[in-house]
Amino acid sequence: MSRRCELTAKGAQVGHKVSHSNIKTKRRFLPNLVNVTFLSDTLGRAVRLRVSTNALKSVDHRGGLDAYLLKAREAELSPKAVELKRAIAKKMAGEPVAAAS
């Protein structure tokens, strides 16, 4: 399992640990990933994803998983998230739009 967010594509970065005597040694900065179960309103089911806490905050800010995925670019999503995005878009396109009366 890679250490990469399935929604934002955040991954590990490489940097230096710097000692008091300014000796630099390589280290990895890992993203803060959590396993989360999202509820898709459109699909009507639960979806488990491994996302960063920053992405979790972004999903909440945009109004849920469906809204986040529809607005996100496919290039930065994981294959699982792209499949979800397409399923949500297909389901939303198939539903008739309720006319305001």
From Swiss-Prot:
GO terms for biological process: translation. Coiled coil: none annotated. SUPFAM superfamilies: L28p-like. It comes from the Bacteria. Keywords: Ribonucleoprotein, Ribosomal protein. GO terms for cellular component: cytosolic large ribosomal subunit. The keyword Membrane does not apply. Signal peptide: none annotated. GO terms for molecular function: structural constituent of ribosome. Belongs to the bacterial ribosomal protein bL28 family. PANTHER family: 39S RIBOSOMAL PROTEIN L28, MITOCHONDRIAL, LARGE RIBOSOMAL SUBUNIT PROTEIN BL28M. NCBIfam families: L28. The initiator methionine may be removed. HAMAP family: Ribosomal_bL28. This is Large ribosomal subunit protein bL28.
